[in-house]
Amino acid sequence: MLYELRVYDLVYDNRFGMHDKFENYTVPIFKKHGFRVLGFWETMIGANYPQLTYILQWKDLAERQQKFTAFFSDPEWLEACRIMDPKGPFIEKIHSSIMFPTKYSPMQ
């Protein structure tokens, strides 16, 4: 298994719009395409506040590529972007790391 850590540095004045987009559009479309989301977190204290962090689980890189390709071409996602994006940018920067567990990790 592989794990993807995704951290979004959010635009402060538009951070609630990002949460709305995830709750109402992103998460349902993730479910539709079989994304395995291990959790979502919002930074409470930290140098890059506000941030949205989440972890995805993948069998391999091919699965990641296939599911993200389907996600980004999904008509529901394209409509969500059309509706939400004119409200202004939500994200300043995206950090993404693909990780695999160490042999001593409980996440095997």
Predicted regions and their residues:
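The conserved glycine-aromatic submotif of the RRM
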Residues: 47-53
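Intrinsic disorder/low-complexity detector
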Residues: 1-5, 9, 41, 46-47, ...
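Active-site acidic-Proline motif in GNAT/NAT acetyltransferases
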Residues: 12
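Short hydrophobic/aromatic beta-strand micro-patches
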Residues: 9, 55-57
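An amphipathic, aromatic/His-enriched active-site/gating alpha helix that lines ligand/cofactor pockets
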Residues: 16-38, 59-97
